[in-house]
Swiss-Prot record:
Name of this protein: Transcriptional protein SWT1
Family under the similarity heading: Belongs to the SWT1 family.
Domain PINc span(s) in chain numbering: 395-522
InterPro entries associated with the record: PIN-like_dom_sf, PIN_dom, SWT1_Regulator
SUPFAM superfamilies from the UniProt entry: PIN domain-like
Lineage: Eukaryota, Metazoa, Chordata, Craniata, Vertebrata
Skewed-composition ranges (Polar residues): 56-69, 322-335
Location of region: Disordered: 30-75, 308-340
Pfam hit, one: PIN_4
């Protein structure tokens, strides 16, 4: 199609050149004839002639209006034709112009059609040629329309010039005779000229607006038309895509403004009025071309409107998008958090609705699913087949909600406990317990226990996620099954049903229900399920580690257990001892948290009310309810403002030590940590007892801590029997240990107690050294600090404080040197001499006398070595503080002329 159109364009240009040459020859011949008739020739006339030829050539080449220009020059040269111009000559010339143009154009159009037809037969198919000729006809239509308009303007312009020439000619007689008729004709001509000028100007403006841009150059019209034609051809859309285009702009076609439709109609009428003056054949071709151009213009307008619509919509969307991001980041973050809260609220409400419906559990699943539910509990190793289950002995402990929330630490220790006489100890979490924890976490059951429900949920989730074989969960299928026709009236019945189901699933295992609910324990005992509280279970675990009494299970006996499970192979002695020690240590910590928490809460409330009055709750760092860790955090936070004013500042070290050891005990319980906790608690209570008894709370707590210390000493000796003792003697001693603990016997049976007491006395000397250094350094700092308003310092003068600071720095340096030598990896007996010489030199405690060997034995113990490490770190911090204080007052001391050798003692 491109080849057809290009060849057609080339042929059109060739015929245009031939047509122009012929018209120029004819005009030259007519001019030669007129020159022969003329008698006078002037150089001015020759110049006008040349200008006329140039203008005629340009106009004829562009628009084909050569005859008008030649006739015009003939009127200027011939004076005899002026009288008859208006009557005959004018009409004949108009006819000549109108007839001349269509003849030439008809020949041109027929030639182009013939050439295009030949080219189509030789080069391409008929369809391709038809498309090419159609495009060329559209272009010719546009060019002829513009040419007709320009011809109309040239005619009007020629009329004006002719009338002016007629007025300028000196013919007096004709003017006088024909004056009235000429005057009337003149007026009519002027009116017609004005009307034609207005019409032509309006038509030209409309054409320019519709077809041509502003400041358009007519000389480049042909080039631009061909270039635009090439662009249209190269981007021509196939017929299939035209349907999609119509679908895209179908709604836009019917939304065009009425003003646009009117302008289209006016343009169409104007084009048709100009085309009616042409020949019939030309008229038909032009009408067809105008229809095609009109359709193309409409399509172009539709595309433009569609593009504008897309542009405006995209711009609007961009503006809206930009406006949405004009808000500050804080509002965006707040909106994001609000959206997240709303989403979480929806999820929680939906979950709460499901939880509410899940109380009424579904009907029993079909037969055959019960055996598959064994797979849901744990994997094959943890849940063997039914045949292999009969030979397994497990201790299955069903945990109630209150135990998980109030004694989670005990549950964690219990999960890691090895019980002799059983293959494994497994914790069972009923389905209803998980539901209750979930609702408590959301605050729907008990709002004040949310902080306890969340850790329990995390513990269960982490254990199941890590596939811990010692924690199972009751599946939904098992919970939905009815047992003995029992209807689940409340959650207690569902927990009890879980115990009965696991008794059936594992008949050779012991199932224990652990709950603090007395009524639920009663139901369990009536139903044949062994039910214990947390305290009772703690004692029972110790009994099971020693006796392995399974009399509550009718299907198993002690002889079968001893025959099936050899204790030497399945339950080692060390494992049983460690399990018993962990349980006892955990019990001691729980008792300490209860009694010490009661005492510290009373102290905190009393001292805060004295300091702040009724506003003490607003000032308080952590609001109740408190744990022991929370109370210690409050003491640390308010020490300077409240407790440091009424107590010694060195007591803060004891509070910090309590806090660190308690955090350590929550992660892993060991004997040394528990012992440090009890000793620090005793020191703290003794210090506060000098101020007040706090309504009798401190004496009771002090007595309970002493009992726990005694029990700890018993545990240390009784759980480490000698290798020569038999297993039976060990079991008897462990049984007596449990009885002693249960009866709170305040008697020490440890034969090594005097040595332990000796070590405590030696350590008390080291503690007194630390307390003396701490108190003296505090007095020095207060005296040297000019901004301090406290007057509790015993040092009166600035000079005395400075001298005392130098002595303290030397003492701390010596103590650190001795402690660091003891804490060295390859330390021996000789390394303790430095510290021992310092203690003897300063005679810190004259009442306590000990040797270097006894000091070495004391610091060689693990617990005292750990304490010594903590003390070394605290002494290093104090040494740095002393150096900073000495450097800050050095210039002032030097200006006062104090002894230089004293200043040289600074490290």
């Amino acid at each position: 199609m491109l080849l057809c159109t290009t060849s057609a364009h080339k042929l059109e240009t060739v015929y245009d050149h031939k047509f122009l040459k012929m018209s120029i020859k004819e005009s030259c011949a007519k001019e030669e004839k007129s020159q022969k008739k003329q008698t006078i020739s002037s150089p001015t006339f020759n110049e006008d002639k040349k200008k006329g030829e140039i203008s005629a050539g340009s106009t004829s080449s562009e628009h084909g209006v050569q005859p008008v220009s030649t006739k015009k020059r003939k009127l200027k040269a011939d004076d005899t034709d002026n009288v008859y111009y208006n009557a005959n000559r004018k009409n004949s010339k108009r006819l000549n112009v109108e007839v001349f143009i269509p003849k030439k154009r008809l020949k041109f159009s027929s030639s182009t059609q013939a050439v295009s037809y030949l080219n189509n037969n030789q080069m391409t198919s008929h369809s391709c040629s038809s498309n090419g000729t159609k495009d060329t006809k559209v272009k010719d239509c546009k060019l002829t329309n513009i040419g007709s308009k320009l011809n109309y303007e040239i005619k009007n312009h020629s009329r004006i010039k002719i009338t002016k020439d007629m007025k300028s000619k000196p013919v007096d007689q004709t003017k006088e005779k024909n004056w009235p008729s000429l005057l009337i004709q003149k007026k009519m001509k002027e009116l017609k000229k004005e009307k034609n000028n207005k019409d032509s100007s309006e038509e030209l403006e409309k054409c320019k607006k519709n077809h041509l841009p502003q400041n358009y150059n007519f000389s480049n019209m042909i080039k631009e038309s061909f270039e635009s034609g090439r662009k249209k051809i190269s981007f021509k859309i196939p017929k299939k895509s035209s349907t999609t285009l119509q679908k895209l702009v179908e709604e836009k076609i019917f939304t065009i403004d009425s003003s646009k439709s009117k302008s289209k109609q006016e343009e169409k009428q104007h084009l048709q009025s100009h085309q009616m003056s042409l020949n019939l054949a030309r008229h038909k071709t032009e009408n067809s071309f105008s229809d095609s151009t009109h359709k193309q213009s409409v399509c172009e307008r539709i595309r433009k409107d569609h593009c504008e619509h897309q542009g405006t919509s995209s711009s609007d969307s961009k503006e809206n998008h930009a406006q949405s991001f004009e808000t500050p980041c804080s509002s965006v973050s707040s909106e994001d958090t609000q959206d997240a809260d709303e989403e979480m609220q929806i999820v929680e409400e939906l979950h709460a609705a499901r939880v509410g419906r899940s109380v009424d559990l579904p009907v029993v699943p079909p037969s055959g699913e019960l055996m598959s539910m064994e797979i849901d509990l744990v994997d094959e190793d943890a849940h063997p087949s039914a045949a292999h289950t009969a030979s397994d002995t497990k201790l299955l402990i069903v945990m109630d909600t209150n135990v998980l929330m109030n004694h989670l630490k005990f549950v964690k220790i219990l999960k890691t406990t090895e019980i002799p006489g059983f293959d494994t100890l497994v914790l069972i979490i009923p389905w209803v317990v998980i539901q209750e924890l979930d609702r408590m976490k959301a605050g729907k059951l008990l709002k004040h226990v949310q902080h306890k429900a969340v850790p329990a949920i995390h513990f269960i989730n982490n254990s199941l996620k890590s596939q811990d074989r010692k924690l199972w969960g009751q599946s939904l299928q098992l919970a939905s099954q009815k047992l003995y026709g029992l209807s689940d009236e409340n959650n207690d019945d569902r927990v009890l049903k879980c115990c009965l189901q696991y008794q059936q699933l594992f008949p050779c295992s012991l199932v224990i229900l652990c709950t603090d609910d007395r009524n639920l324990r009663t139901k369990g005992l009536i139903s044949g399920v062994k039910s214990l509280s947390k305290e009772d279970l703690d004692t029972e675990i110790l009994n099971l580690t020693l006796n392995t009494d399974l009399c509550h299970q009718p299907c198993i006996s002690k002889q079968q257990l001893n025959a099936e499970v050899p204790p030497a192979k399945e339950t080692p002695k060390e494992g049983a001892a460690n399990s018993g020690l962990s349980i006892l240590l955990e019990r001691i910590i729980c008792d300490l948290e209860k009694c010490l928490g009661t005492a510290l809460s009373s102290i905190l409330e009393t001292e805060m009310k004295i300091a702040f009055g009724n506003l003490w709750m607003e000032v308080l760092y952590l609001k109740p309810p408190w744990t022991l860790i929370n109370l210690l955090q409050c003491f640390k936070k308010h020490w300077l403002a409240v407790f440091g004013l009424v107590m010694e500042n060195n007591l803060l070290v004891t509070v910090e030590s309590l806090y660190e050891n308690l955090c350590k005990a929550n992660k892993a319980v060991d004997f040394t940590t528990v012992k440090f906790l009890l000793q620090d608690s005793k020191s703290l209570l003794h210090a506060f007892s000098t101020r007040s008894n706090y309504d009798g709370v401190l004496p009771q707590t002090f007595a309970q801590v002493n009992k726990l210390l005694q029990v700890l000493a018993e545990v240390k000796t009784k759980l480490k029997p000698s290798s020569s003792e038999s297993t039976r003697s060990k079991e008897q001693e462990d049984t007596s240990l449990v009885k002693l603990h249960n009866q709170d016997v305040n008697v020490f049976l440890d034969s090594n107690l005097p040595q332990a007491t000796r070590h405590q006395e030696i350590w008390s000397v080291l503690e007194s050294v630390w307390m003396s250094i701490y108190q003296n350094s505090t007095d020095v700092f207060q005296t040297l600090d000019s901004s301090s308003t406290l007057t509790t310092s015993k040092i009166a003068s600035f000079e005395e404080a400075f001298v005392y600071l130098q002595k303290l720095m030397v003492a701390v340096k010596d103590i650190l040197e001795g402690i660091q030598r003891i804490l060295a990896p390859n330390s021996n007996y000789q390394d303790v001499e430095t510290l021992y010489n310092f203690l003897i030199k300063y005679e810190v405690n004259k009442n306590v006398k000990f040797t270097a060997r006894e000091l070495y034995d004391c610091v060689s113990q693990t617990e005292y070595r750990e304490r010594l490490t903590i003390g070394c770190r605290q002494l290093i911090e104090m040494e740095c503080t002393m150096q900073q204080c000495s450097a800050s007052v050095y210039m002032e001391a030097r200006s006062r002329g104090w002894c230089e050798d004293m200043l040289n003692n600074r490290p």
